[in-house]
């Protein structure tokens, strides 16, 4: 191989590497279209396992036609556990995805449950002490505002609450009791009004919306 060929090969390899890196940067946003409106999630690089899993699910269309099956006012909206039209998800592909868990990436206090946070659902500690995440279901935090004194109940000597986290819960709101228990892997960067509408919907005794809220599509986008 002569010098020109070697240089061309190295240059091409560099371009491909830069292109791959740029594509990965573009892949940090996901736009969801629902029958209540749209919203965009930014995925965190700090939780690479969850980011890769979420992008994979989005690209294969796993969320299309699924519902927000659990909604609690002033708390959160959970998606990915139901199918549009009231179909039973048991035995379906999305059911198998939920059972394929992801290793926990809990990074409190860097990533915490402030308003608009996106986190992975999971089963309880009694059968899941490793706090592994559901492979499909996620929830979006609505939460509520807290006074500084109220936040003391969520602190301990082993897990103090940094001032910037306290400030976020006092000025933006959130669900501090979930910190350290679930993996936060993203944040709503556009369309929080849609989440507000979803969380304000009327639900039954099982927290299921009385009027179906479903995801029309989820697509990876390069910007919010």
Model-derived features: positions:
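Bacterial N-terminal signal peptides that target proteins for export
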Residues: 1-8
